[in-house]
């Protein structure tokens, strides 16, 4: 019970004896009783004496001593069987009183050896290590104590008049109780070490406490009589109180777990009290244990006193600590009422230790290996064994012969009755024999029968699975499920089509802007990012198409059985009506219009049958029924006789007879014949049954042939066969409906799950597509605004410079600087190139020394997507002196003029949603763009990327995104998509393209030119683009050379948007075995 100590166990004392010469007595018996030369058994008799000496003198109380005692007991058993008249004095000292008692009986020697075996087993159990973590020691101690109890119980049951005190009935009974109590204690230790439930532990502790408590009075009495040592009684008292405390403690834990906090507190109080009582008894035990430990034959382990003190003190501390905690919890939290101790229910007992019978002990393989062969097996002559084997073969021949006769007769009877169709074929004639008319017999065919009604009950409860599929009962549930499947399938198809359409629109809008801005358009082609999304959408669509084929198969199967399934769930009345309709040959499943009183319309000739014909049918039926009853009775009796014969043959043993007659010559045959006569009555009864069976079968065959030849029987039989065939067809149809319905329900249930999973996947994919499109649209809107601003600023600067040259440099405003761009496209992919969204900034100030002719500044840049106002809503302020404003020409022509003349698109009025990067990801319709012009003849980009161009700067590592803008932190773009329904990440995410691996092949642009590998011509005159076929490499002209002033930046690794297809989710794979 404690971590550092194990509970001490009592050791039973050993009986001692003196040397006995068994060899001489056995030799004398061999010579006198068996008529053999005893010198041939000198070695065996020497081994016999040596075995006794080893068992009772030389061995210690360990496993070796136990095995030697087992071996010697087995020899005693064999001696008693062969030499029951053996008489040798066996002196033994009483284990407790040390008084010597001698008896000339093998039974006394056997009882003494059994007692010593029990004592040795108790010593083995006490010496086993039972510390925590040593499960094998616990098992060995538990088994040894149960075996000791079994040995002692055998003494009480078989040796009624014990000559010594140690083997008296009361003392042995007390010793059995002690060993079983200790076995229960060891099992409790194992249960506590394995951390079983508190309720189970309390039951085992209750049994252990009860066992020790019941031994208190007996141990005191034996101490008073001077049989037991005083330490035994004190140890039993201490353990009785200790395990009572353990029982109450674990029951308190169980009550606390069950919410009975008041009962828990009371039980903890009782447990603490019992533990303290055990502690108070330790003083007397410690004083008496010293004598038991230091004796010549100690009955307690050397550390018994210290170990028990530690265990009891630990229990006291455990109870006190838990009680204080329980009091505090109840006072502060539970406020539960404390019941009285007497009102607490008693703890149930669980018996965990029973004695192991001695027969089971010696039957164990390990014991059989120890005891070895019989020393005197040669005393039974081999010829006797051979004769016994011959006799056994004769018995086996009789058993085989009678079994064959029985099986042959039973098979012959069954074959004859099957050939005649009996007794089922008599049913068609019984109604006629009862005088109800030739058609009344057919009414029984309208009964659906137990099998069909069982099918009906199953279907009414929701099929063979009793509604476990959740589809409901009958056809309504399946119809509703099929409708749900179609609805979900339609929604999923719409989602897939919508997602593909959104990707197509996004790609089209991107390419429009690419055509519009040419080499300045730096947004990646959509194909770089949408390949995996398109593949996933395609795979899901193909999976849905495959599932639709299975849906069609299930629908067809369901259509063919729906009406029959509905009939099965309609109840008995509908089934009877259907069977009646089938018998009358009516169309319609439920037999509408059928006459309720008659199943078949027959002519007057068929209805009329003379009373004499009916009487003849009745007589033949009675004759056949009586013969069939007799046949069944004969079959049953014959089987019983055969079983009794086999049992007698199995238990018959004439070994003793053969041994007694082993000296007689040529008497084997007569002995065998006389012994085999005991089986003759059984053989005769089987033969008579065979004869009676043959006669009855002939009688049945004759009577049945006469029955079917009667005129009335012929007419009734013909009608019956016709209608029975119709009934069987209906039954087969209902069986098919029942079996197919199980397949349909299973397929529909799996189909619902499949489409539900598919819908979730498609929904997640569509959400990701929408997010991607919104991000791309937001990025495209920013790029368009910036490029338009560059164009307008460039055009305005040219006009202003022209105006300034007309003024002669005397005054006027300087050319406006190029609007500062706050992002190098790293921000468009998740970087933080600027602290906020792209802003045009304040208008530039007038250059020094230039005359100000107007109060108006340069025009503001175009609005960003998240700004509501257009240029018409925020026009530039009116100029004070427009004739002298050098910037006025910027708004009279060029792209700014066109931008101001166009009203803002209504699609741009909704403010976009902002995600993790600096972009405003608008999820509305694509931005208005000019129509895609017809493809030119050649497309060869020739611009040289500058330091500030997006091509040069977008793939560098951007600065980190400000903390306030990281709403999708940790996202990784489209390379690693989130799981369905777990949204996150933006177009660029917080991990920009700078960390990409560029070892993969360069991606292709939608027009066939690899991104990052365009070839540039030598002049601006050759900058007209030329369309190539999709996937075709661009044409290389001799006059063109690869741009070499600055190496092209490596292309970004294509990030894959890996939305798993439904097939990767373990979903539908096609096939119809079973559906879905």
Curated annotation (Swiss-Prot):
Residues 837-846 have a biased composition (Pro residues). Residues 775-794 have a biased composition (Basic and acidic residues). Belongs to the BRO1 family. Residues 8-413 form the BRO1 domain. Residues 489-550 form a coiled coil. It comes from the Eukaryota. GO terms for cellular component: endosome. It comes from Mycosarcoma maydis (Corn smut fungus). Residues 795-804, 1021-1036 have a biased composition (Low complexity). This is Vacuolar protein-sorting protein BRO1. SMART domains: BRO1 (SM01041). Involved in concentration and sorting of cargo proteins of the multivesicular body (MVB) for incorporation into intralumenal vesicles. It is found in: Cytoplasm; Endosome. InterPro entries: ALIX_V_dom (IPR025304), BRO1_dom (IPR004328), BRO1_sf (IPR038499). Residues 889-910 have a biased composition (Polar residues). PANTHER family: PCD6 INTERACTING PROTEIN-RELATED, TYROSINE-PROTEIN PHOSPHATASE NON-RECEPTOR TYPE 23. One of its GO terms (biological process) is protein transport to vacuole involved in ubiquitin-dependent protein catabolic process via the multivesicular body sorting pathway. Keywords: Coiled coil, Cytoplasm, Endosome, Protein transport, Transport. Residues 775-1076 are annotated as: Disordered.
